[in-house]
């Protein structure tokens, strides 16, 4: 489990680990999830507040003056102050069920934060691998350009010396320019990968170009990967855990709706004082004290039962979403495992094909220089070699990317001790 929680360390790339730390600290989607979690905490506190009595204080000052037409003229001030208290007795559990719903919403928010974290870690690693793959492909293309330029110079010399016709020279030139035309698209893809990575880190596109300009090899995963058992996967996946908590919240809301069928009992009380003098508030005073229960019984309300049906339907939908999340989880794990295994086999086949293409290219070049074959064979061998080199480098990236997707499907990137306190900043993935 600890290895799964910090799966990117298995790739043994310190720069990737550094980028992931920066992404956790600066990603805007993660900060949004933290803000939603703070909202859920506040809503839970609001729901819990209904379990306790309320107490309010009030005060007023009034100036009174009689009309002179009455026969005398008088004026004065009246001051009043008081306290009002109320407490809804939760006889049928409506308030408690609303607290349960808010608590489930809060835990769903925690799982949502973890889900965003898991996706962020995977997306950061995937973009980093794509970046290194583009660098590797670009290096292979540039190396092939050097070889093809030498071939072109050779055909040009042989053509000028009358040892060959111009067809070989034009074929070499065509091959050279065709390879050269692939370089701009590779550089464009490399730049786009850097920019996407910068945005994931919460930085301005272009900020990482200097930092990541030096080419490095694509990080490769270990030969053996432990994936655990399906039951463990279901327990780890934040999206499955979130769907379960959303189902619990909606189940509680059904209870809230059903509680509206029954009477509500509230205890109210108030105490007040009215006086004409602030200097001596106990003189010329009027005290008032009141209190007692209030019961509200729904005799005719045609919205209560339809609301129960609405909440029950929403509960059914939440259950279906939970079941779908479980199936999606199992599907993604199975697909990732198959993709990883098949790409390993494909990479091995490509490696053997590239080795054969290297031998063919060397032999064709030797025979051409010796005048034993025409340049068409050299041209075909160089094309095949470049193609297999490019495919092999793409396959290296695909193997690592499939491992990353597998770790994401397994819910890797957090532990049960992961801090999700929104007020304490981003959750640490370790």
Listing of model-derived features with the role each one plays in the protein:
Residues 16-18, 78-80, 126, 171, ...:
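Transmembrane beta-barrel architecture of outer-membrane proteins
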Residues 31-32, 48-49, 89-117, 143, ...:
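Sec/SRP-type N-terminal targeting helices
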Residues 95, 104, 111-229, 339, ...:
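Periplasmic alpha-helical coiled-coil/stalk elements that build and connect Gram-negative outer-membrane
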């Amino acid at each position: 489990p600890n290895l799964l929680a910090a799966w990117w360390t298995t790739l043994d790339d310190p720069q990737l680990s550094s980028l992931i730390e920066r992404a956790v600290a600066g990603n805007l989607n993660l900060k949004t999830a933290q803000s939603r979690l703070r909202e859920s905490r506040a809503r839970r506190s609001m729901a819990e507040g209904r379990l306790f009595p309320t107490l309010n204080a009030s005060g007023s000052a009034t100036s009174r003056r009689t009309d002179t037409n009455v026969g005398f003229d008088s004026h004065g001030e009246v001051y009043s102050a008081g306290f009002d208290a109320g407490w809804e007795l939760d006889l049928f559990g409506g308030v408690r069920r609303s607290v349960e719903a808010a608590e489930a919403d809060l835990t769903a928010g925690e799982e949502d934060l973890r889900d965003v974290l898991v996706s962020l870690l995977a997306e950061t690693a995937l973009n980093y691998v794509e970046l290194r793959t583009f660098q590797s492909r670009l290096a292979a293309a540039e190396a092939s350009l050097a070889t093809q330029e030498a071939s072109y110079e050779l055909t040009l010399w042989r053509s000028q010396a009358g040892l060959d016709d111009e067809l070989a020279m034009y074929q070499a030139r065509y091959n050279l320019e065709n390879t050269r035309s692939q370089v701009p698209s590779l550089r464009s893809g490399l730049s786009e990968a850097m920019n996407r990575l910068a945005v994931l880190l919460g930085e301005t596109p272009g900020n990482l170009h200097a930092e990541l300009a030096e080419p490095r090899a694509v990080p490769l995963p270990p030969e053996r990967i432990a994936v655990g058992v399906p039951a463990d996967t279901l327990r780890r996946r934040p999206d499955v855990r979130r769907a379960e908590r959303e189902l619990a919240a909606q189940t509680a809301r059904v209870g809230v709706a059903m509680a509206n069928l029954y009477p509500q009992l509230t205890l109210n009380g108030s105490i007040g004082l009215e006086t004409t003098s602030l200097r001596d508030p106990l003189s010329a005073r009027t005290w008032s004290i009141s209190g007692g229960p209030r019961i509200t019984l729904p005799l005719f309300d045609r919205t209560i039962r339809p609301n129960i049906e609405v909440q029950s339907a929403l509960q059914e939908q939440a259950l279906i979403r939970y079941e779908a999340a479980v199936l999606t989880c199992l599907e993604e794990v199975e697909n990732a495992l198959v993709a990883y295994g098949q790409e390993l086999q494909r990479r091995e086949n490509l490696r053997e094909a590239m080795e054969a293409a290297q031998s063919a290219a060397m032999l064709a070049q030797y025979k051409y220089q010796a005048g034993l074959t025409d340049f068409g064979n050299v041209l075909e061998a160089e094309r095949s070699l470049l193609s297999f080199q490019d495919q092999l480098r793409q396959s290296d990236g695909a193997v690592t990317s499939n491992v990353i997707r597998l770790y994401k499907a397994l819910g890797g990137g957090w532990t049960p001790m992961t801090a999700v306190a929104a007020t304490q900043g981003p959750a640490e993935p370790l």
